[in-house]
Amino acid sequence: MARILGIDIPNQKRIEIALTYIFGIGLSSAKTILKKAKINPDKRVKDLSEEELVAIRNAASGYKIEGDLRREIALNIKHLTEIGSWKGIRHRKNLPVRGQRTRTNARTRKGPRKTVANKKIESK
């Protein structure tokens, strides 16, 4: 496995796809990096030379990835909750943030159902 920016990427995959294993680099970012490094995106990771790996590292060094990106996202969410914005309140309550409905659905964000028992009707 080749190491790029401290992350092991799979050898058997095309370099274009293998770069997406790095948190913060998607397919479009991977294509941009490979274009900067002047490397064929169809090339397999195992076929890359050391010079090509160095070129990829240099091209990708400007991107915020892995720990730095996760930290920035967490700080952004923390800031939203501290200032009491709508999005911050939704984050705090573990509800959908982007305006989705919650009466039905939203199970991923809310977690498993909490069943509420019905009151028994007393007969006279």
From Swiss-Prot:
Biological process according to GO: translation
Pfam family, one: Ribosomal_S13
Gene Ontology CC annotations of this record: cytosol; small ribosomal subunit
Compositional bias per record (Basic residues), positions renumbered to this chain: 93-117
Molecular-function GO term, any one: tRNA binding
Keyword annotations: Ribonucleoprotein, Ribosomal protein, RNA-binding, rRNA-binding, tRNA-binding
Keyword check for Nucleotide-binding: no
Region spans: Disordered: 93-124
Domain of life the protein comes from: Bacteria
Family of this protein: Belongs to the universal ribosomal protein uS13 family.
Self-association state and partner proteins as the record states: Part of the 30S ribosomal subunit. Forms a loose heterodimer with protein S19. Forms two bridges to the 50S subunit in the 70S ribosome.
Role: Located at the top of the head of the 30S subunit, it contacts several helices of the 16S rRNA. In the 70S ribosome it contacts the 23S rRNA (bridge B1a) and protein L5 of the 50S subunit (bridge B1b), connecting the 2 subunits; these bridges are implicated in subunit movement. Contacts the tRNAs in the A and P-sites.
Protein name: Small ribosomal subunit protein uS13
Species: Mycoplasma genitalium (strain ATCC 33530 / DSM 19775 / NCTC 10195 / G37)
Lineage of the organism: Bacteria, Bacillati, Mycoplasmatota, Mycoplasmoidales, Mycoplasmoidaceae
Gene name of the encoded protein: rpsM
